A protein has these predicted regions:
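Short, flexible domain-boundary/linker segments around small modular repeats
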Residues: 91-107, 167-170, 233-255
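Helix-loop elements that line ligand-binding/catalytic pockets
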Residues: 175-204, 208-212
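C-terminal motif of bacterial Sec signal peptides marking the signal peptidase cleavage site
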Residues: 26-27
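A cross-kingdom marker for long, charged
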Residues: 43-44, 201-301
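N-terminal Sec/ER secretory leader and immediately downstream segment
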Residues: 31-135, 139, 286-290
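Short, structured motif recognition centered on aromatic/hydrophobic residues
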Residues: 46, 60, 117-128, 136, ...
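Acidic/His-rich structured neighborhood in mature extracellular/periplasmic domains
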Residues: 100-184, 190-191
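Bacterial N-terminal signal peptides that target proteins for export
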Residues: 2-16
Length: 301
C-alpha cells in the first residue's frame, strides 16, 4: 500500500474498511501490477470471508468490474494530483495540522468509495446463507486472534518492538534509512501513544457483532430472494452504508478528534521535520514513482 498513507493514518483504519482501503491506497513498489490485479485480490478477499457460491461469485465479479472501472476513471486522477501535492509538502517542514488535513482527505476519499460500493455489499449480505454467516464469524474470530497476537501478547517491551519494526519499515520505505536519533524519536512517539489495543479490539468485536446482526435484520426484512438484475432495496443499502461510515476513523480535523488521532499527526510531522535534505529527496522520488504509476493506470483499460 502507499507507504505515506499508511504512516499518516497509522491505526486510523479499521478492519471494516479493508475493501475501501485496498482500492483507495492500492500500491506498493509495483503499484501498477498490484492495481491491475485488484479485481482478483478483492474477489478472493471477500470470498475468504464468505465462502461464496457460484451465483454469488458471478455477480460479485461483475460488481467489482464496475467499481474498478469507476475508480480508475474518477478517483485515480485525484490521487495522482494528491501525490503531486505531497511531493511539494515533502520538501518542507510540516505541522501536525497539515498532516491531519491530508489524513482527512484520505478519509473523504474512503467515504466516496463506500458510497459507490455499498450496494454490491448489500446485495451480497442479502444472499448469505446461515453456513456462510457462520463462516464469516469464524473468519472474524481468526482475524481478532491475529490482532491479539500482534498487539496484546507478550511483554510491554516486546509489543513495543513489534510496533516499532512495522513503523520503521513504513518510514524507511518513504525516507530511506533512518538515523539512530530518528529511530529513537519514533520509539519515543510510540511509547507515548494513546493507542489502546485492548479498547481497539473490543471495538472491533462490537463492529463485527453489529455487522452480523445487520445481515440478519436485512434478510428478515427481505420477503423473497433478490433477483440478480434487481436493484437492492434503498433502505437496506442505506443501512449498510451507515455501518460502513460508522467505521471510518474520526475526522482528524474535527474538534472532537480523539487524542490518538492527533498524536498520529504530531508523530509524523515530528519525524518528517527531523529528516535531512537527502531523505526528503528520497521521499519525493518515491512519491513521484507512485504518481507516475497512477497516471499510467488512468490511461489503461
Amino acid at each position: 500500500m502507499l507507504r505515506l498513507a499508511r504512516i499518516i493514518t497509522g491505526r486510523l483504519r479499521s478492519i471494516g474498511l479493508a475493501l475501501g482501503t485496498a482500492l483507495l491506497l492500492a500500491g506498493c513498489s509495483t503499484l501498477q501490477l498490484g492495481y491491475n490485479q485488484a479485481h482478483t485480490l478483492l474477489y478472493w478477499w471477500i470470498d475468504g470471508y464468505a465462502d461464496l457460491g457460484d451465483m454469488q461469485s458471478a455477480r460479485l465479479r461483475q460488481d467489482i468490474d464496475g467499481l474498478l472501472a469507476w475508480h480508475r476513471q474518477q478517483e485515480l486522477p485525484a490521487y495522482a494530483q494528491r501525490l503531486r501535492q505531497w511531493r511539494t509538502l515533502a520538501a518542507q517542514d510540516l505541522t501536525a495540522e497539515q498532516v491531519c488535513r491530508e489524513a482527512d482527505a484520505l478519509r473523504t476519499a474512503t467515504s466516496r468509495l463506500m458510497e459507490r460500493g455499498h450496494e454490491p455489499l448489500t446485495r451480497l449480505a442479502l444472499t448469505l446463507t446461515p453456513a456462510q454467516r457462520d463462516h464469516l464469524q469464524r473468519h472474524q474470530t481468526k482475524s481478532n486472534e491475529g490482532f491479539e497476537k500482534d498487539f496484546l501478547r507478550g511483554s510491554a517491551s516486546a509489543r513495543l518492538e513489534r510496533r516499532l519494526e512495522r513503523t520503521l519499515d513504513r518510514y524507511e520505505t518513504l525516507y530511506g534509512r533512518l538515523t539512530d536519533a530518528q529511530v529513537a524519536l519514533v520509539r519515543q512517539s510510540l511509547q507515548a501513544s494513546p493507542f489502546d489495543p485492548a479498547r481497539t479490539l473490543a471495538q472491533r468485536r462490537e463492529r463485527q457483532a453489529e455487522m452480523l446482526a445487520l445481515i440478519g435484520q436485512l434478510q428478515a426484512g427481505q420477503p423473497r430472494p433478490l433477483a440478480a438484475s434487481e436493484p437492492v432495496p434503498r433502505a437496506a443499502g442505506q443501512a449498510v452504508l451507515g455501518w460502513l461510515q460508522r467505521g471510518l476513523f474520526p475526522s482528524p480535523t474535527g474538534s472532537d478528534a480523539p487524542a490518538w488521532v492527533r498524536h498520529g499527526c504530531e508523530g509524523f510531522a515530528q519525524l518528517h521535520n527531523s529528516t535531512s535534505p537527502q531523505q526528503r529527496r528520497h521521499a519525493q522520488d518515491v512519491l513521484q514513482g507512485y504518481e507516475d504509476d497512477l497516471r499510467a493506470l488512468t490511461t489503461q483499460h
